[in-house]
C-alpha cells in the first residue's frame, strides 16, 4: 500500500495548516487521487493492523439500510458510538440514503438495488452512481457523509469503482474507506457476473489531524508488506444476502496497531 504512505507523506510535507470543525486543527491538501488494482491483492494497510471486523460489519450495516448502532454494537463494532443519540440513532445517514432515498412525491429509491440492476442490464451506462449527500437532510444527520458519492464503470468484463470523499481523515478514516469500497466493488462484481477491476479513491479535503502527526510519522518508518487476498463465498449472488461469514482475508500480515484519538 505504497499509495497510502505517499498520501501521508504528501500531506505532511506540502499541506496547509488549517482550523476545523472539531477544534483540533489539521494539515490538509485539496484534491488527491489513489488507484488500486484489485487483481493485485486486497488493499488493506500492512503498515498498521486494521480491525477488519469493523470494516466488514459497517459495510453490511450500510447495505441493510440501517441507521441505528444496535447492529454494530451487537457485533462488537464501536466506530459510530460517538455520534449516536441515547437511543442509538444517527439520523438519515449512509444506509438510509443508499437504500431509501426520499423523493419529493413521497417515494423512496433503493439506489443499491437500482445500481445492481443497471449494471446487469446496461453495463455501458454512465449513470451507475450512488449518492449519500442529500442536501435536504444533511442537517438531520449525526455526521454528514464524508464518502459521499461513488460511480461504477464496466470495461472488458471488469467492474471498477470511483469514490469521491469530500472529507478524508487520512490517518484513521481513509484506511477503512479504501478497504470498505474495495470490498463493495468485489461484492458488486460477484453478483453482476463481472471481475473486480480498479478502485479509484478521489479525496477532496484530505487532512491529517494535529494530534495524529506523531503517529503518521511512525507509520512512515514502516515498510509495506505483500497484500493479502480477500476470498468471498462464491455462492452468494444477491448483494443483500452477504453475511460476515462469507468473507475471509487470507495471508494478512501487518505491523502493530497505532492508536490515535478520534476528532468528534
Swiss-Prot record:
<feature type="binding site" description="in other chain">
    <location>
        <position position="177"/>
    </location>
    <ligand>
        <name>dUMP</name>
    </ligand>
</feature>
<feature type="binding site" description="in other chain">
    <location>
        <begin position="207"/>
        <end position="209"/>
    </location>
    <ligand>
        <name>dUMP</name>
    </ligand>
</feature>
<dbReference type="InterPro" id="IPR036926">
    <property type="entry name" value="Thymidate_synth/dCMP_Mease_sf"/>
</dbReference>
<feature type="binding site" description="in other chain">
    <location>
        <begin position="166"/>
        <end position="169"/>
    </location>
    <ligand>
        <name>dUMP</name>
    </ligand>
</feature>
<dbReference type="Pfam" id="PF00303">
    <property type="entry name" value="Thymidylat_synt"/>
</dbReference>
<comment type="subunit">
    <text>Homodimer.</text>
</comment>
<feature type="binding site">
    <location>
        <begin position="126"/>
        <end position="127"/>
    </location>
    <ligand>
        <name>dUMP</name>
    </ligand>
</feature>
<feature type="binding site" description="in other chain">
    <location>
        <position position="21"/>
    </location>
    <ligand>
        <name>dUMP</name>
    </ligand>
</feature>
<comment type="function">
    <text>Catalyzes the reductive methylation of 2'-deoxyuridine-5'-monophosphate (dUMP) to 2'-deoxythymidine-5'-monophosphate (dTMP) while utilizing 5,10-methylenetetrahydrofolate (mTHF) as the methyl donor and reductant in the reaction, yielding dihydrofolate (DHF) as a by-product. This enzymatic reaction provides an intracellular de novo source of dTMP, an essential precursor for DNA biosynthesis.</text>
</comment>
<protein>
    <recommendedName>
        <fullName>Thymidylate synthase</fullName>
        <ecNumber>2.1.1.45</ecNumber>
    </recommendedName>
</protein>
<keyword id="KW-0545">Nucleotide biosynthesis</keyword>
<dbReference type="InterPro" id="IPR023451">
    <property type="entry name" value="Thymidate_synth/dCMP_Mease_dom"/>
</dbReference>
<dbReference type="GO" id="GO:0032259">
    <property type="term" value="P:methylation"/>
</dbReference>
<keyword id="KW-0808">Transferase</keyword>
<keyword id="KW-0963">Cytoplasm</keyword>
<feature type="active site" description="Nucleophile">
    <location>
        <position position="146"/>
    </location>
</feature>
<keyword id="KW-0489">Methyltransferase</keyword>
<dbReference type="InterPro" id="IPR000398">
    <property type="entry name" value="Thymidylate_synthase"/>
</dbReference>
<dbReference type="GO" id="GO:0006231">
    <property type="term" value="P:dTMP biosynthetic process"/>
</dbReference>
<dbReference type="GO" id="GO:0005829">
    <property type="term" value="C:cytosol"/>
</dbReference>
<dbReference type="GO" id="GO:0006235">
    <property type="term" value="P:dTTP biosynthetic process"/>
</dbReference>
<feature type="binding site">
    <location>
        <position position="51"/>
    </location>
    <ligand>
        <name>(6R)-5,10-methylene-5,6,7,8-tetrahydrofolate</name>
    </ligand>
</feature>
<dbReference type="InterPro" id="IPR045097">
    <property type="entry name" value="Thymidate_synth/dCMP_Mease"/>
</dbReference>
<comment type="pathway">
    <text>Pyrimidine metabolism; dTTP biosynthesis.</text>
</comment>
<feature type="binding site">
    <location>
        <position position="169"/>
    </location>
    <ligand>
        <name>(6R)-5,10-methylene-5,6,7,8-tetrahydrofolate</name>
    </ligand>
</feature>
<comment type="similarity">
    <text>Belongs to the thymidylate synthase family. Bacterial-type ThyA subfamily.</text>
</comment>
<dbReference type="InterPro" id="IPR020940">
    <property type="entry name" value="Thymidylate_synthase_AS"/>
</dbReference>
<dbReference type="GO" id="GO:0004799">
    <property type="term" value="F:thymidylate synthase activity"/>
</dbReference>
<feature type="binding site">
    <location>
        <position position="263"/>
    </location>
    <ligand>
        <name>(6R)-5,10-methylene-5,6,7,8-tetrahydrofolate</name>
    </ligand>
</feature>
Amino acid at each position: 500500500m505504497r499509495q497510502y504512505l505517499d498520501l501521508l507523506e504528501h500531506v505532511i510535507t506540502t499541506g496547509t495548516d488549517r482550523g476545523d470543525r472539531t477544534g483540533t486543527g489539521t494539515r490538509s491538501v485539496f484534491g488527491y487521487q489513489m488507484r488500486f488494482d484489485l487483481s493485485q491483492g486486497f488493499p488493506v494497510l500492512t503498515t498498521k493492523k486494521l480491525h477488519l471486523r469493523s470494516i466488514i460489519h459497517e459495510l453490511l450495516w450500510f447495505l441493510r439500510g440501517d441507521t441505528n448502532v444496535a447492529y454494530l454494537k451487537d457485533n462488537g463494532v464501536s466506530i459510530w458510538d460517538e455520534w449516536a443519540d441515547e437511543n442509538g440513532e444517527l439520523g438519515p445517514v449512509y444506509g438510509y440514503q443508499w437504500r431509501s432515498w426520499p423523493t419529493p412525491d413521497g417515494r423512496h429509491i433503493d439506489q443499491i438495488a437500482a445500481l445492481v440492476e443497471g449494471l446487469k442490464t446496461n453495463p455501458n451506462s454512465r449513470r451507475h452512481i450512488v449518492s449519500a449527500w442529500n442536501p435536504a437532510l444533511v442537517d438531520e444527520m449525526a455526521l454528514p457523509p464524508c464518502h459521499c458519492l461513488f460511480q461504477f464503470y464496466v470495461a472488458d468484463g471488469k467492474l471498477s469503482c470511483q469514490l469521491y470523499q469530500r472529507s478524508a481523515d487520512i490517518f484513521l478514516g481513509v484506511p477503512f474507506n479504501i478497504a470498505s469500497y474495495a470490498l463493495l466493488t468485489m461484492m458488486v462484481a460477484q453478483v453482476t457476473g463481472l471481475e473486480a477491476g480498479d478502485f479509484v479513491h478521489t479525496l477532496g479535503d484530505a487532512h491529517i489531524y494535529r494530534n495524529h502527526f506523531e503517529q503518521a510519522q511512525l507509520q512512515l518508518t514502516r515498510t509495506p508488506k505483500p497484500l493479502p487476498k480477500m476470498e468471498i463465498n462464491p455462492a452468494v449472488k444477491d448483494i443483500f444476502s452477504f453475511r460476515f461469514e462469507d468473507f475471509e482475508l487470507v495471508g494478512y500480515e501487518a505491523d502493530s496497531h497505532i492508536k490515535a484519538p478520534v476528532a468528534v
